[in-house]
A protein has these predicted regions:
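Long, internal low-complexity/basic segments
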Residues: 298-337
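Short, small-residue-biased leader/transition segments that mark boundaries at the very start
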Residues: 2-13
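Active-site-proximal cap/lid insertion segments
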Residues: 15-29, 47-193, 202-213, 275-279, ...
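C-terminal cap/loop subdomain of S1 sulfatases and analogous C-terminal strand-loop tails that border
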Residues: 149-155, 182, 194-197, 202-288, ...
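Amphipathic, non-transmembrane alpha-helical secondary structure
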Residues: 5, 37-51, 126
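Outer-membrane beta-barrel proteins
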Residues: 30-36
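A short aromatic-rich beta-strand->coil structural motif
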Residues: 43, 61-64, 174-175, 200, ...
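Non-transmembrane alpha-helical segments in soluble domains
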Residues: 44-48, 115, 122-129, 133, ...
Length: 337
């Protein structure tokens, strides 16, 4: 990949469902092993500097994108047998224990493969951490473990693992380890995707180098000191886009901004619009404190003050990023832009 080679001096591109990948020079390799183990092996090789691929006197940045756990979770092609054996005899109701789960869904049969994939990823990622320690790099390396989305896994009676404001889909891990600099704790910071890059730069001591046009914020001071004087966000945006216009060949050319919402410390709100009229067609409103499993969708008209406050915060955030809902003034009767 010419683009990948331009962005990164050492690159491995891999398709986890197919047993092949391409290296920096575009050469194809067929590892014939489960992708997370292959990827952790490539990271370990890079850290050990096999083949003299990096300058050991300079800092390094590694991004590892492991595909599992990822649907369909149907067979041992999606996980390692040793991991599946840990779960194969477990009753489904001992694995899927959330009260909003529907065990009658066909997807429930995937649970054992799903948890096997999670276990395998844990082991593969652990191998990287072990290597950092063996090489004496663990004390001066910022390690971040995150995900792009969650997995509903039969919660809310939906087959879709993502693309929703439900907690199982929207809440993801963001674990940061920096020995001696960050004290272990759990923080309720509402970190959003645009904040990740500037925060990572801040963690690396490069806060002064963050470009002015970056929309996200650097929350590194909060990681170093939970009492740091910095304004915490009161909410995080939920954005759902679907396919828009297509050309004569059926290829998607634009997207349709189907839903916008906001998640705060207490509430989750999502508004969905009709494709033709762009008027409200569905809403989701949950009190995540009183109803943590989001079992009761609250009517908007019976919670006007709460909805007005949430829409006000959401409108300001959409305006800040020049979102299509703001530029087209979608649902302006509810959202004060």
């Amino acid at each position: 990949s010419t683009q990948a080679k331009t962005l990164f001096p050492y690159t491995t591109l891999f398709r986890s469902k197919n047993p092949h990948y391409w290296d920096t020079d575009g050469k194809r390799h067929d590892p014939k092993e489960w992708s997370p183990l292959h990827e952790s092996g490539k990271v370990i090789s890079y850290l050990k500097n096999d083949g003299n691929v990096r300058d050991t006197k300079k800092p390094f940045f590694i991004m590892v994108g492991m595909n599992p756990p990822h649907s369909p979770y149907r067979s041992l092609n999606d996980c390692e047998e040793q991991d599946f054996n840990l779960y194969k005899d477990q009753p489904l109701d001992s694995l899927l224990i959330r009260p909003n789960v529907d065990l009658k869904m066909k997807k429930a049969e995937s649970a054992r493969y799903y948890f096997a994939s999670v276990t395998g990823v844990d082991r593969a990622f652990g191998q990287i951490l072990t290597t950092l320690k063996e090489l004496g790099l663990d004390k001066n390396t910022v390690v971040i473990f995150a995900s792009d989305h969650g997995e509903t896994m039969c919660s809310q009676r939906t087959d879709d693992p993502k693309n929703s404001p439900y907690s199982e889909s929207m809440n993801i891990p963001f674990l940061v380890r920096f020995p001696g600099k960050i004290q272990p704790r759990v923080d309720d910071l509402l970190l959003s995707a645009p904040d990740i890059m500037p925060t990572v730069l801040g963690l690396c001591g490069l806060g002064d180098s963050i470009p002015a046009e970056v929309q996200g914020r650097n929350f590194a001071p909060l990681f170093f000191d939970e009492k740091a004087e910095i304004v915490r966000p009161t909410g995080a945006l939920y954005i759902q886009n679907v396919d828009g216009d297509k050309d004569e060949n059926g290829l998607v050319q634009t997207y349709f901004p189907s839903s916008r919402g906001i998640k705060t410390a207490q509430y989750t709100l999502a508004l969905y619009i009709d494709r033709d009229t762009k008027q409200l067609k569905k809403s989701l409103l949950f009190d995540d404190v009183k109803d943590p499993y989001q079992l009761h969708n609250l009517p908007l008209e019976e919670n006007k003050e709460i909805v007005a406050q949430l829409c006000g915060e959401m409108g300001a955030m959409l305006k800040e990023i020049n979102d299509p809902w703001y530029t087209e003034k979608i649902l302006s009767d509810r959202i004060p832009y």
